[in-house]
Amino acid sequence: EFRRVLFRSIKAGFPADKIVFAGVGKADWEINLGLDYDIFCFNVESVPELEIINELAAAKGKTANVAFRINPNVGAHTHANITTGLAENKFGISIEDMDHVIDVAQEMQNVKFIGLHFHIGSQILDMGDFVALCNRVNELLDKLEARRIRIGHVNVGGGLGIDYGHPDRQPVPDFKSYFETYDNCLKLRPYQTL
C-alpha cells in the first residue's frame, strides 16, 4: 500500500518532493496522502483517474503534478503475461488518446501536466526492446514540441530479465548497458530530465 511505501521512503531519507506515485487502482485516500505530502507527481493511467486527482487537489486548494502513463504499443520479447506496452495491454493511455488527454488536463485548474511515463514489461532480455521504446518516446516528444507543449519529466522503463532456463547462454543485461541505451537513443531536450 502507498502509505507504507511513502513513510518508509521518507524515513530512509527520500524527500517527498522526489517521490512519484505510480500504479493502477489508486484509492482516494492514497491520492490525498500524496497531496498532503506534496509528492513530485502522480503517474496517471486514465482520464477518470485524472479527474479524481483534479477534484481531490481542488478540495485541498492544491495543484497536483501529473505525468501520463502512455501505452507506447512497443512489444517486449518476454512472456505474454508480463508485457505492459502493447496496445492490447490494459495499462496506460493509448497513443491515439494522448492528445485528447493532454487537452483535458490543460482545461483543469488543479493538475499540471509535467511529463510522460512508459513501461513495456518485465523480464526483458533484449536491449533492442528498449531501443524501440526510445524511438517511440522520441516520436511523442517531437509531437509535443510541434504543439509547443514543454514537459520536463520523462520516465521510461521495463524490467531487466534473467534467462533462468539457460543462464550461461545469455548473460544478464547489466545496468550500464541499460542506461547507456537510454542515453544514446533518447533525444531529450535540454530542459528535460530522465
Residue ranges, per PLM feature:
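Glycine-rich tight-turn/loop motif centered on a GG-T
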Residues: 35-42, 80-93, 126-130, 165-176
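C-terminal active-site-proximal or functional interface alpha/beta core segments in diverse enzymes
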Residues: 122-194
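Conserved radical SAM core fold
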Residues: 7, 27-30, 72-88, 120-125, ...
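Glycine-enriched alpha-helix->loop->beta-strand junction motifs that scaffold or abut catalytic
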Residues: 11-18, 33-41, 58-63
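Structural preference for beta-strand elements that scaffold enzyme active sites
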Residues: 18-20, 39-41, 63-69, 90, ...
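Conserved anion-binding
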Residues: 46-112
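Structured alpha-helical segments in the cores of large, soluble enzyme domains
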Residues: 9, 22, 71, 95-111, ...
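Short, small-residue-biased leader/transition segments that mark boundaries at the very start
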Residues: 1, 5-6
